[in-house]
Amino acid sequence: MAKFDAKSFNERAFGKYMSAIPNVKLNKLKESRAIVADQRLRETFVNNGQTGTVYAVLPYFGLIGGDAQNYDGVSNLTPEKTDTFEQGVFTYGRMMGWTEADFSYDVTGGVDFMANVRNQINRYWNDRDQDTILSILKGIFAMASTGTGNVKTANAAFVSAHTYDISAPSTDAVTTDAMKVSATTLNSAIQQACGDNKQKFSLVICHSTVATNLENMKLIAYLKYTDAEGVERDLGMATWNGRLVLIDDSMPVEVKNVGSTGGDVSLYTTYILGEGAIGFEPVGAKVPYEMVRDAKTRGGEDTLISRKRNAVSVAGISYLKTSQATNSPTNAELENGKNWSLVSNGTDCIAHKAIPIARIISRG
């Protein structure tokens, strides 16, 4: 893979070249087990032989339960039935193209240009997938009024119980330490959301302002990795109370005027995910990479085009596809609460405490 050249470009070889480098950041996310492979997605969107499938409704089995009955050699057993719910899952596609001039050269020298291209493309798609996951989470916490009857009530209960708000958004007061994350905030938030299931939480996604606040209190430790050239680099991730922390300045920040005393304050959202919260499965594009030449522009230029398709499921939550214009939802459509609901059987929903997803709202 020596040249950025449409004439000599081999899409299959380049695809193998792209997958040959370890994706350190994605691997760390998978280690947290908050973002996991979902075999149901692969069976539905890859292995079933039906091309063009972009959305599916899958059975979602409830947990067994009921009170144990007395085994005395006399009493008859009355078995319980496990409810079967339905869950909407979906795929999304994204594409982008770059010319050779779009890629920055490694000024330290000694690095093959196409290796640099590969690294930059990997980082680009990591960031875009991260943006999509954040849009999904934003949509989930906007579903309080989705549905009718028991379903609407359950959706509102999820949003309320899984939101730990210490920002005092209606209080006309200057920001105090009590309105910012502290040593006890994380534990309190996950306990409120899931009770004795709180140990399932394994990943925190927060704004750098929140991370800096935690760093100043010596509550987080940053992770590093060694690249292929043996250089130690920042991974842009940390740990907090043994949970992986992903730092992302595209996290929601709302600027709100709380009154004449407090003035404008910034309200930061921090997401917390548990094991299996997001099922994420690359399902492939027909032509994932190709290079085209435009002979008439600026004396001729080559453009590298990259396409991705991923399938997504969210634990205990169904994507409804209520408001989606094309086969692939945009991030704005994923942020629409009307597209999300707790998994249900049409009448009743699963218990929201089984869903390892929560958020903290704070002033820093």
Annotated model-derived regions:
Residues 1-22, 271-274, 282-364:
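Protruding loop/beta-arch "assembly-hinge" segments enriched in small, turn-prone residues
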Residues 58, 85-153, 194-210, 295-316:
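Long, contiguous amphipathic alpha-helices that act as assembly "spine/axial" helices in icosahedral shell
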Residues 83, 225-243, 326-346:
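Short, cationic low-complexity segments
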Residues 145-235:
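Extended, solvent-exposed, turn-rich assembly/linker loops in the middle of proteins
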